[in-house]
């Protein structure tokens, strides 16, 4: 496991989407008045496939759904608490329910999960999103722990035609996954370190904390639960039985 390269998952994901937009004219990017350096390049080079709907997360979902229903691959980007809680009715009706009738590939990107924006106060805290989004039928919930995993997910998100919620921390994180690690998104988890009697199961940024604990305690296993819905429950239970 490598902990050398420091990057934000947001920047790596957006840069990867930017590169895919050059190859695939069917990819669209929408945001709710929320910026990032990579967005400037997308707006300048692919302005006909970039749309800032303003501070209107509900409309962000509506427009994204419409584009996806016509066959587009859509990435909708906003702060995690706002894209989930403020637009929850639209997500439930237009994405979760409608996608069971017709394939809809809308990828909601929520930056600032958990207490990433702790200094911005409770309006920007996002502690409920996992529970809310896992309730929805036919909805994938992806919670990567490092930028390498977020990067690997891009092509998978293009190919899998269903609504998804991608949540990640806003802060810079170290690299956990290497090219040698064989990650299966269908399984939904990866045993980063094998232990004997104790195993820590974590997701997202907290996987870094779990790794730090294992270094202090010693013989502790670590499972990174990067896919919160769906995941291979049987395989997870079989893995945990060893502890």
Residue ranges and their predicted role:
Residues 8-20, 152-162, 172-216, 234-237:
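Glycine-/acidic-rich phosphate or pyrophosphate-binding loops and their flanking alpha/beta elements
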Residues 28, 199-201, 221:
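Conserved beta-strand elements of the Class I
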Residues 31, 202-204, 224-227:
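Active-site proximal loops enriched in glycine and acidic residues that flank catalytic Cys/His/Asp
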Residues 1-167, 172, 182:
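Thiamine diphosphate
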Residues 84-85, 207-208, 229-230:
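Loop/helix-junction capping segments adjacent to catalytic residues or to phosphate/diphosphate-binding pockets
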Residues 47-48, 209-223:
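Short helix-loop-beta junction
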Residues 88-89, 127, 210-211, 233-234:
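Conserved strand-to-helix beginnings and helix N-cap segments that scaffold or border functional pockets
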Residues 216-242:
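Generic long, charged, amphipathic alpha-helical segments
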């Amino acid at each position: 496991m490598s902990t050398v390269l420091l990057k934000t998952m947001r920047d790596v994901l957006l840069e990867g989407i930017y590169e895919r937009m050059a190859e695939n004219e069917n990819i669209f990017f929408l945001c709710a008045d929320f910026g990032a350096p990579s967005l400037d390049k997308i707006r300048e080079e692919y302005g006909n496939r970039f749309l800032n709907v303003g501070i209107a997360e509900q409309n962000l979902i509506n427009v994204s759904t419409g584009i996806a229903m016509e066959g587009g691959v859509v990435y909708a980007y906003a702060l995690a608490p706002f894209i989930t809680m403020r637009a929850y009715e639209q997500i439930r009706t237009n994405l979760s329910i409608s996608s069971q009738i017709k394939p809809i590939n809308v990828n909601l990107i929520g930056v600032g999960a958990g207490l990433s924006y702790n200094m911005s106060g409770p309006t920007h805290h996002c502690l409920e999103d996992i529970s809310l989004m896992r309730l929805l039928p036919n909805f994938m919930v992806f919670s990567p722990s490092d930028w390498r995993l977020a990067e690997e997910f891009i092509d998978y998100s293009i190919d899998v035609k269903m609504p998804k919620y991608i949540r990640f921390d806003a802060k810079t994180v170290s690299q956990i996954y290497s090219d040698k690690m064989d990650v299966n998104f269908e399984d939904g988890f990866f045993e980063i370190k094998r232990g004997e009697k104790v195993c820590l199961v974590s997701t997202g940024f907290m996987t870094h904390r779990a790794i730090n604990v294992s270094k202090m305690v010693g013989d502790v296993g670590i499972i990174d639960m990067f896919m919160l819905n769906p995941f291979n429950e049987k395989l997870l239970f079989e893995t945990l039985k060893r502890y």
